[in-house]
A protein has these predicted regions:
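Glycine- (often His-adjacent) and acidic-residue-rich active-site loop
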Residues: 6-40
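Short, Asp-centered acidic motifs that coordinate Mg2+ and/or phosphate
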Residues: 1-2, 69
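Conserved hydrophobic packing residues within short motifs/helices of P-loop NTPase cores
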Residues: 2-4, 49
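Crotonase-fold acyl-CoA enzyme core
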Residues: 39-135
Length: 135
């Protein structure tokens, strides 16, 4: 089974719209949608391959990390931009921090900077980088 993160017609979206700022995280009700999605993916019972074509950020990083393998197009970007608005990626970091060294995880979680596909492969976040046409 393949989990596609992003596609040529635009990016798929998982999680809150960060354009709204921290207001999306300030409600009285806890957000449980991502947790339910993560449990479903984790418990699916078949090998999963993430195909990343575009931006893989925020909740998309968590979903990708739940997959057994990850392949990215050479133009893909990865990151946790919620850090830029003062939100720590608490839900997402649980799923990817074991894949990479602690300092690499801290860099992603604290800076909110995006990294390219080759850097993501270098730090162990993904397995392969391929030309977009081969994805």
């Amino acid at each position: 089974m393949t989990v596609a993160v992003g596609h040529p017609g635009g990016n798929r979206h998982i999680g809150g719209d960060l354009q709204e700022g921290t207001a999306i995280f300030g409600g009285d009700e806890p957000t449980t949608d991502f947790g339910r999605l993560a449990r479903t993916v984790r418990d699916i019972g078949v090998p999963l391959v993430a195909r990343v074509n575009g931006a893989c950020v925020a909740g998309g990083m968590g979903l990708m990390a739940l997959c057994d393998l990850a392949i990215a197009a050479d133009h893909a970007r990865f990151g946790l931009p919620e850090a830029r608005i003062g939100v720590f990626p608490m839900q997402v970091q649980v799923y990817f921090r074991h894949l990479i060294l602690p300092r690499h995880a801290a860099e992603l979680m604290l800076t909110g900077e995006l990294i390219n596909a080759e850097r993501a492969r270098e730090i162990g976040l993904i397995n392969y980088v391929v030309p977009a046409a081969e994805l």
